[in-house]
Amino acid sequence: MVAIKNILVPTDFSKFSDNALKQAVEMAKQNKAKVYLLHVIEVVQTCAVYYCLDQQTINTLDKNSIKSSEDMMQKQIKKVGSPKDIEIISYVKKGTPYEEILKEQEGKKINLIVMAAHGQTGLISHLLGSVADKVARHAKCPVLLVKGK
């Protein structure tokens, strides 16, 4: 078994993601591991049929989304509690969630991904597949899917 030293926790700020972060922090305590808390902002369509956003508006929206996400991650860390001996590194990426999660797994040498087992349901999930499903299928490390309580 590979030693767990780097744990990635993707978050969408739901109570389910809170549970995943709590689980990751407990595992980090046991293994003296780092926790990487990641939020991925999906790239939005900037043009509709008759209207496009200008670059300044897009840049402002991006900046505001990143700042808001960073603030929400700090609140999430405070909510679940962070032991002094566990390092939690939070950051935001922009892109397709499952793709960014998989890139981070490679780039940060992640040994374990802990994420909420929830998300899209019904027809959309059936047609597209959930983020958790895609990550579990394609990750090169173990993935722990945490169910809500």
What do these predicted ranges mean?
Residues 2, 75-113:
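Structural beta-alpha unit
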Residues 2-55:
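Small/aliphatic-rich secondary-structure junction motif
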Residues 38, 89-93, 144:
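General small-molecule cofactor/ligand-binding pocket signal
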Residues 52-56, 107-108, 131-132:
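Short, hinge-like loop/turn segments at secondary-structure boundaries
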Residues 112-134:
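Glycine-rich, Arg-bearing micro-motifs that act as flexible, cationic patches
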